[in-house]
Amino acid sequence: MGTNEKLNLTMLCDFYELTMSHGYFEKGYRDRITYFDLFFRRCPDGGGFAIAAGLEQIIEYIQDLHFSADDIDYLRERNLFSEEFLEYLANFKFTGDIWAVPEGTPIFPQEPIITVRAPAIEAQLIETFLLLCINHQSLIATKANRVVRAAQGRTVLEFGSRRAQGADAAILGARAAYIGGCHGTACTISDQLFGVHAGGTMAHAWVQMFDTEYEAFKAYCEMYPENCTLLVDTYNTLKSGVPNAIRVFNEVLKPKGITKCGIRLDSGDMAYLTRKARQMLDEAGWTECQISVSNSLDEYIIQDILRQGAQIDLFGVGERLITARSEPVFGGVYKLAAVVNEDGEVVPKIKISENVGKITNPHFKKLYRFIGNDTGKAIADYLCVYDETVDDSQDIEIFDPEATWKRKTVYNYTAKELQVPIFQSGKLVYKSPSLSEIRKYCLEQVDTLWDEVKRFDNPQTYYVDLSQKLWDIKYGLLKKNS
């Protein structure tokens, strides 16, 4: 298959999804309605929250879900599956329901980002791809949001395509970084596909191509006078790079009345060099010249150099963002929460572990976020059984699901149900917002979190509480199965 030929991603699944599905088919469970939750157990980098991303690619996948003739032939050659099961797969389509938290929403451990209600085989076969999408893009969106917050209002561009772990990681990573708050990307195809504004300056090769740095700068400035950012560290930033940039700005831009321009540094002591460069530019009258920096940046380095007085207007953040280098795995999991029995009753299911953090919250659930009416800040998230409702005109007592004696009465609040319907009976019912709308929503929602929750180090725990009914069901199942 050529690299430009569209892949049928239905077969992008762990092989045991197929062997289990075959078992469900042969043992009479193929039509049994099941409920699965996709959630994660801890925030990356020890942070206080994560950012949901990846839903749009899941929607596209579900809509195109089918097994091709080649897929069926491959599975037949494995000599593991019955002809009846292969015939079922040949006519396979998704007929279930999916609810999800919208992209850009701050999310917390142990709460369902996605809930699937579908026949057992349908729900099982989509597990791998759902996790792939959410785990990758939520990881990058979360890292991007940390970087953007560290930059304290300065522009942040995603610069990591060449260091990404594959083409999809570069393309979708740029999308996720934009959701998390980045202002644009260097990845051209992400602009073409998603509208993530692509931009860039020059590489050192441009400067080296000419006989002198001055000639390289002048040629570039003459070509792009309205968008001129010069890379000043090819030879010597302060002795030649910045002086040559100022000379070219004076010769090319000043006669045209253009005052907006830029320089970029990709090496050296960013705090020291940007302070000196800013002084030189200002003394030459180029006070509107922006200073951009790159070079293995992350949120901690950005924080440090800004504390040291760095004079920077724009950060280009590459490998440590696009690979989430400090913690390159988002631990999303997909677990069975309930099944429907022969009498049509929803029966809760639980997964128990010696590791308390791996014990699941059972049942088909609703997820609420309580927002204080007086502060506009998030108070807590609240999980309850599907047939419960929250009346936010009434006070409600919430409690720590582990340290149950820690209780709090919430009043003067608005209860917002976080999950929204995406598919109903296999039909798409959700209208996806534009990427710029998702980014705006993300920044607005992050602003509803208290600063204590947003700390990079030792953030305050944000609680995801259980209703009394859900807690009773969970601990009843623990007693029954322990």
Show where each model-derived region lies.
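Hydrophobic residues within beta-strands of alpha/beta enzymes
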Residues: G199, I263, I291, D313-F315
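Gly/Ser/Thr/Ala-enriched C-terminal appendages of enzymes
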Residues: G2-R32, F36, D45-G47, A52, ...
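Buried, small/hydrophobic-residue-enriched core segments of structured protein domains
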Residues: M1-I33, R42-P44, L80-F81, L86-T95, ...
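Short coil/turn segments at secondary-structure boundaries
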Residues: D73-Y74, T142-R146, G160, K454-T461
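Residue-level "edge-of-site" marker
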Residues: H204, S294, G318
